[in-house]
Amino acid sequence: MVTATIYHATPEQTDSTPDQVASGKFINMDNPLKHRWIAVSKDLEAKGLTFGVKVRITGIDTLDGIWTVQDRMNRRWNNRIDLLVNDSIQGGKWENVRVEILNDDNRL
């Protein structure tokens, strides 16, 4: 179980290149949510949540479903995921969110 939050592709919430995630992929800035990409804290990478891994997220109501790890969070965070969403979705923090790694066959 992890804590989940949302983030937007803006310099204030990312870095100087908000249109590119840590894996090197580029974000569709008109509709970032369509990618269903997440950022993960460094400690979760050691548990198998590495770039390209697909996961099933449950416990966030309308944002539940299949997402892909493509970004990395600031090192100050632990046991946390961040869902890339459109600017129209504001605020959100959920505790005890389940993240299930899907089979290697589901890797992008």
Language-model features: where?
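Solvent-exposed, well-ordered loop and adjacent helix/strand elements within mature globular domains
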Residues: 1-108
